[in-house]
Amino acid sequence: MERCGWVSQDPLYIAYHDNEWGVPETDSKKLFEMICLEGQQAGLSWITVLKKRENYRACFHQFDPVKVAAMQEEDVERLVQDAGIIRHRGKIQAIIGNARAYLQMEQNGEPFVDFVWSFVNHQPQVTQATTLSEIPTSTSASDALSKALKKLGFKFVGTTICYSFMQACGLVNDHVVGCCCYPGNKP
């Protein structure tokens, strides 16, 4: 079975590619988790974050925004010592700050899911790339999403991270045409 060329032989990576990446996500809390995790990969590989995902979930209350937003500096101090996650103070603080920004959006009547999906007109965008080199690392939509998230107070949401988030959550489907997960290729 052919997969996208970025997938290694790691079973965790294969399962992620086959079952999650590019699948449209419409749960606001899951989208919150993914924007936070995508920010953790800045300067690193996604597999590094993926291998630590369960630890992140444990450390950040299953990404419950209310509980994460209530975390304090003593929590940050504890987490920078936790080898189960990426021990970057700024990235840890970003998750907490992002939870606060997320809650502010929700309190203002804008569900995160509606906000995020508005950047693709609430419709998954399917590329028709035949090779990885044809897949962009950012687009005008990820530029706009990044700018809007930053304006709302989100951190670690540059355009490349936003595009990775859009790919991961199925706002765009960048499986290459020959991949088993490309639309229409799955049995």
Positions of PLM-derived features:
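HhH-family (HhH-GPD) DNA N-glycosylase catalytic core used in base-excision repair
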Residues: 1-187
